[in-house]
Amino acid sequence: MAAVSSVASLRGADYENGLRGGAGPSGGGQDPGEDDPMGRGTLDLDLELLTQGRRNRRVGGRTAPGRRSGGRGGSGGGAGGLEELEDEELEEEEPGELTGDQTIEDPELEAIKARVREMEEEAEKLKELQNEVEKQMNMSPPPGNAGPVIMSVEEKMEADARSIYVGNVDYGATAEELEAHFHGCGSVNRVTILCDKFTGHPKGFAYIEFSDKESVRTSLALDESLFRGRQIKVVPKRTNRPGISTTDRGFPRARYRARASSYSSRSRFYSGYTPRPRGRVYRGRARATSWYTPY
């Protein structure tokens, strides 16, 4: 609106100057409509002012140098001004003209970004692998590698009823060889070769556990059979109980020796010694007691 007001004021001033200069042949002036009957000079001025106003609004105060000439004297000045205005608008609308090289991406920067993305992906994969390893470590071990299972007394007795004791086993024998030797008796669940806990050497005997009790009775037929050049001893396994030896098969081992035997040995050794019996003999209703000598 300011540009239109300035154009109107300029046109009024030009008109007054033309009237003052003489409006006829006597005045010596020139009619503004003689050389330019269409008033194109004024139109060129108007277009130039309008173009300047639009430039200031679009570019924010920037004015392209060398494009102000609107062609005041020629008849094609107005059309030239419009063409320049359209060209300038097209140039302003093209992206990246004002920013220059800033819109062009740096290949080195792209390579760095790609490397960072690869490192992040590798870190994610390593984290997943670590989580899987932790899960596997927290899981219970497989049955084949499990440690000794604590069994109840009933379970132990039931397993012992399906097991046999094999004595006089060669020290170089393996569990596979023993399993092959008793394979015809039935399905073998487990073969245990006892070793010394200090030296790690075999003790010379083993235990074989079968799937059923019938296999135990069948395996007794291999008693005194030859295994690796030795005559082995095969007997049913017994549950370990207090006071029963695990090596002396079938012969219980008392915790304490009888005092009578020790006394008798001493009596034989010392002829004048008479042992004192532990029992008492009651006779009738008498309160008095008397010691007796069994020998």
UniProtKB/Swiss-Prot annotation:
Keywords from the named record: Coiled coil, Cytoplasm, mRNA processing, Nucleus, RNA-binding
Family annotation (CDD domains): RRM_II_PABPN1
GO cellular component: cytoplasm; nuclear inclusion body; nucleus; ribonucleoprotein complex
The keyword RNA-binding is annotated on this UniProt entry: yes
Record Pfam families: RRM_1
Positions with biased composition (Acidic residues): 83-96
Location of the protein in the cell: Nucleus; Cytoplasm
Keyword RNA-binding part of the UniProt annotation: yes
A GO biological-process term: cellular response to lipopolysaccharide
Coiled-coil ranges (or none): 106-140
Domain of life: Eukaryota
Gene Ontology molecular-function annotations: poly(A) binding; RNA binding; RNA polymerase binding
Region span, Disordered: 1-102
InterPro entries registered for this protein in UniProt: Nucleotide-bd_a/b_plait_sf, RBD_domain_sf, RRM_dom
UniProt cross-references to SMART domains, sorted A to Z: RRM (SM00360)
Protein's job: Involved in the 3'-end formation of mRNA precursors (pre-mRNA) by the addition of a poly(A) tail of 200-250 nt to the upstream cleavage product. Stimulates poly(A) polymerase (PAPOLA) conferring processivity on the poly(A) tail elongation reaction and also controls the poly(A) tail length. Increases the affinity of poly(A) polymerase for RNA. Binds to poly(A) and to poly(G) with high affinity. May protect the poly(A) tail from degradation.
Cross-referenced PANTHER family: EUKARYOTIC TRANSLATION INITIATION FACTOR 4B/4H, POLYADENYLATE-BINDING PROTEIN 2
Protein name: Polyadenylate-binding protein 2-B
Organism: Xenopus laevis
